[in-house]
Amino acid sequence: MVSYKEAGVNIEEGYKSVDLIKKHASKTFTKGVLNNLGSFAGMFELPKYKNPVLVSGTDGVGTKLDIAFRMKKYNTVGIDCVAMCVNDILCHGAKPLFFLDYIACGKLEAEVAAQLVEGVSNGCIQSECALIGGETAEMPGFYRDGEYDIAGFAVGVAEKDEIIDGSKIEDGDVLIGIASSGPHSNGYSLIRKIVEDLHKDFAGDKIGNTLLTPTKIYVKPVMKLLEKYNIKGMAHVTGGGFYENIPRMFKEDFTAVINKKSYPVPNIFNHLMNLGVEEDHMYNTFNMGIGFVLCVNEKDGENIIKDLIEMGEKGYKIGYVKKGDKSVELI
C-alpha cells in the first residue's frame, strides 16, 4: 500500500506547523475576532460604523522570496506580505480589520512555516489587524524542496462618505512622500540579476540581509494623519515606481511633478545604479526611497511633515499637482 507520506505529503509535519502557527496568530487577535484558528472559516465582527464599506486587497512577495531562500531567513517576508496588502487598502482611507495568508511549498518544514507566519503576525500587529485564518499547502513535485510561496488577503473598513478616491484633488495641491525602508517588495527580479553575491558586505552587513529589510507598513502614521487633515489622495509606491503608482490616485487629468532632489535617495538604490541600472529605469522600477505618497492642501504640507517626524517617520515635500494627463514629470 502506498501512503500519503510516500507521495510526499507529511501530515504529522502539517499538524506540527499548525500548532506553531496558532501561537503566533493568537498574538494578533483584536476585539472583533469571534473564533480561534482551526474552524472552517474565520469570523470577524464589523465595528460600529454608520455606513461601512469593506475594502479589500491581495498580493504576494514575488521573487524577494528567492533572497530569503538563499539567506535562509524566513521571518521577514511575512511582514512584506501583510504590508503589500494593507498599504494598498490604506490608500482609500480604510482601516485594516483582518488578514488571511496562503503558503505553498514542495516539502513542508514546520519550523520554516512558523517563521513565515511569525512575520505575518508581526505585520498584522504593526497594522493593527487580526490574522484570522490561512492555508498551508504541501505540493510535492510542484515546488522544489526548500522553496515556498506566500500570498495574503486583507480586508479593511471605511465610512462610505470618508472614502478617499482622488475626486477632491486640485491643481496646486502638494505631494508629501513618506520614506521607504528600501526596495520593499518590488524590483527583485532585476536585483537578483545584478546582485550575484548576497553575502558581500554592504553598509556593515551582508547585502542579502539589507535586501530582506521588510516593507514599511504605513497604517499607524497615516491613520493618525487622517484624523487631523484633509488628505485628498494616497499612493502606495510599488512596482513601476512613481510613474506607475502616483497617477492611480488621480480621478481627473493631473500631472504629478516630482523633484528628485527633494529627499535623500537611500544608498541601496545608488548601489544598484552603480551595478549598471540606468537612472530612468530605476525610477520606472523602484520606489527610490519613497514608499507612500499623500496629496494634500499646500497649507497642510509642512504641518504633516512635522507630525510625521514626531511619529518617527521621515516625510518630505516631494512635489505638486498640476493640470495634465495622468502622468508623472520628474525634475
Swiss-Prot record:
Q: Which GO terms describe its biological process?
A: 'de novo' IMP biosynthetic process; adenine biosynthetic process
Q: Where is this gene product found?
A: Cytoplasm
Task: Write down the InterPro entries for this protein, in alphabetical order.
Answer: PurM-like_C_dom, PurM-like_C_sf, PurM-like_N, PurM-like_N_sf, PurM_cligase
GO terms for CC?
cytosol
Spans traversing the lipid bilayer? none
- Catalysis: reaction(s): 2-formamido-N(1)-(5-O-phospho-beta-D-ribosyl)acetamidine + ATP = 5-amino-1-(5-phospho-beta-D-ribosyl)imidazole + ADP + phosphate + H(+)
One of the entry's Gene Ontology molecular-function terms is: ATP binding
Which keywords appear in this protein's UniProt record, sorted alphabetically?
ATP-binding, Cytoplasm, Ligase, Nucleotide-binding, Purine biosynthesis
Its pathway is: Purine metabolism; IMP biosynthesis via de novo pathway; 5-amino-1-(5-phospho-D-ribosyl)imidazole from N(2)-formyl-N(1)-(5-phospho-D-ribosyl)glycinamide: step 2/2
Name the domain of life: Bacteria
List the EC numbers from the record.
Answer: 6.3.3.1
Q: What is its main location?
A: cytoplasm
**Which family does the record claim for this protein?**
Belongs to the AIR synthase family.
PANTHER family on file: TRIFUNCTIONAL PURINE BIOSYNTHETIC PROTEIN ADENOSINE-3 (PTHR10520:SF12), TRIFUNCTIONAL PURINE BIOSYNTHETIC PROTEIN ADENOSINE-3-RELATED (PTHR10520)
Q: What is this protein called?
A: Phosphoribosylformylglycinamidine cyclo-ligase
